[in-house]
């Protein structure tokens, strides 16, 4: 039995909440909330209750429908890499009036006599950032969760050499994922989907030019998810297809692996199981679909919900999947459980 210890407004009731997000990197019992009131707040759940005052409030002045994204690190990201990051900090620093053309790299050496990798001074700590659609809804902004300050802005109106990707009028940023490819030397990357069906892949070291622009969808991109190895992903849109793709950081390419056509359009949410074996989608047709992520073939269609499915996600141990719907239900599923290697 689940008991509710406290209920109160964390954002204005008139505006509502866009998203909630949690991660081990935020700290024990902490989560982020994103409201349509233009704020992102960090909360603490202590002793079974929710603190009345947020630990941190970011006033983004962003009023939109795009959900925030915390950093996804590859499952191969080891503790030794984090220790190295604490000794040899790589930071991006904004110069001037938040002009993205003046975003320059600064390398800071943490004093060796401080020694301990536990020190927060000078740590690269890529997990201390959050990405969201900006005050200008076509832009992506990255914010520092320690200082509540804007770290970078990524514009959408960039020149494109691709014949099938327009260089302007992409519209609003509709979905995004902040991630950390193994090949990026500890620098943040962002994959953003836009209203015109295009996606831009960014490396924050070069905020003026994306790694690559692609257009896999004909309607607004509603969801993107990067896999646990940060080597590929899946996207859903308001059109009638799901796209699985690879991401090659060394060559700067995003290539379609599998395109899945749907009988009914509309995918609100996508998720890839942490072990990289399964992918799930949440559809406008009230259905949750399960796919073999590596091969792209359909495995199951779940017909439990009675209204539009808005979101789907997997637990960190790959054992449980959760789906949410406009029918005001959240369902927990145990499907194709991972094999116990013991």
Task: Please place each PLM-identified region on the residue numbering.
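Blade-level signature of beta-propeller repeat domains, shared across WD40, Kelch, NHL, RCC1
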Residues: 313-342
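WD40-repeat beta-propellers
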Residues: 1, 40-44, 140-144, 199-203, ...
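A structural motif specific to WD40 beta-propellers
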Residues: 5-8, 51-55, 151-152, 210-212, ...
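Blade-loop segments of beta-propeller domains
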Residues: 4-31
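Short loop/turn segments immediately following beta-strands, especially the blade-tip
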Residues: 44-50, 146-151, 246-252, 334-342
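WD40/WD-repeat beta-propeller blade N-cap
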Residues: 10-17, 58-65, 156-173, 214-221, ...
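Loop/turn segments within WD40 beta-propeller blades
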Residues: 20-28, 69-74, 121-127, 176-187, ...
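Conserved strand-to-loop turn within each blade of WD40 beta-propeller repeats
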Residues: 1, 34-37, 133-136, 193-196, ...
């Amino acid at each position: 039995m689940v008991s509710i210890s406290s209920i109160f407004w964390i954002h204005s009731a008139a505006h509502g909440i866009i998203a909630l997000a949690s991660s081990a990197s935020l700290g024990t019992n902490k989560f982020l909330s994103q409201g349509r009131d233009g704020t992102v707040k960090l909360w603490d759940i202590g002793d079974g209750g929710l603190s009345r005052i947020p630990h941190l409030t970011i006033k983004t002045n962003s009023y939109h429908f795009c959900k925030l994204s915390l950093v996804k690190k590859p499952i191969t990201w080891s503790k030794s890499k984090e220790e190295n990051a604490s000794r040899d900090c790589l930071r991006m620093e904004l110069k001037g009036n938040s002009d993205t053309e003046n975003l320059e790299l600064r390398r800071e050496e943490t004093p060796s006599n401080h020694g301990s990798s536990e020190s927060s001074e000078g740590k690269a700590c890529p997990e201390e950032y959050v990405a969201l659609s900006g005050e200008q809804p076509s832009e992506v902004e990255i914010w520092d969760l320690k200082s509540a300050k804007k770290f970078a802005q990524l514009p959408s109106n960039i020149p494109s050499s691709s014949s099938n990707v327009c260089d302007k009028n992409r519209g609003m940023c509709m979905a995004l994922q902040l991630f950390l490819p193994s090949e990026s030397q500890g620098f943040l990357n962002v994959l953003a989907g836009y209203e015109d069906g295009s996606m831009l892949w960014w490396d924050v070291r070069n905020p003026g030019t994306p790694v690559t622009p692609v257009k896999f969808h004909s309607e607004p991109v509603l969801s993107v998810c990067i896999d646990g190895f940060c080597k590929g992903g899946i996207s859903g849109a308001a059109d009638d297809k799901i796209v699985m793709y690879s991401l090659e950081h060394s060559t700067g390419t995003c290539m379609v692996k599998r395109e899945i056509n749907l009988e009914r359009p509309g995918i609100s949410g996508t998720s890839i199981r942490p072990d990289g074996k399964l992918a799930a989608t949440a559809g406008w047709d009230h259905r949750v679909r399960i796919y073999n992520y590596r091969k792209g073939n359909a495995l199951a269609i779940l017909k439990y919900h009675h209204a539009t499915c808005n979101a789907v996600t997997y637990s960190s141990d790959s054992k449980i999947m959760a789906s949410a719907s406009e029918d005001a239900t959240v369902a927990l599923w145990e499907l194709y459980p991972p094999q116990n290697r013991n």
